[in-house]
């Protein structure tokens, strides 16, 4: 197996819920990090990036669910670079880095950009399906924290 190396690291800014970053989209945060990494490493051409794997615990709403893909396009990477978003809640970013390492170790790629990005303030409100067409029993949930659409069986087992 190949040995993997982390050649550079940068992190997104850390904010507070409802704070200074509240109006910043998640894909824009991801693009900022990708663009900054590419600018700091001019010896790595954009075309050398074989994949972008980003973790995100709440990929729903305005960011189109695939934050990695949207972020890499916003950062100016070629449209031929694929993007994969990993959702393992709090361990999403670490899982993305581990997945990238595995892909390189197995020889499927040489250069992968991996990490994580999140903005919990931007988590959307979500509405449940109704029990029948045009029903009036929809429920609304804040998707920022906690369970959203709780499966009653899981609630009975662990709730």
What are these regions (language model features)?
Residues 3-4, 51:
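A residue-level signal for beta-strand positions that form part of recognition/binding surfaces
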Residues 1-2, 16-46, 61-65, 72-159:
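Acyl-thioester C-C bond-transforming condensing/cleaving domain
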Residues 10-14:
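Short polar catalytic/cofactor-binding loops
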Residues 48-55:
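Short glycine-rich phosphate-binding loop at a beta-alpha junction
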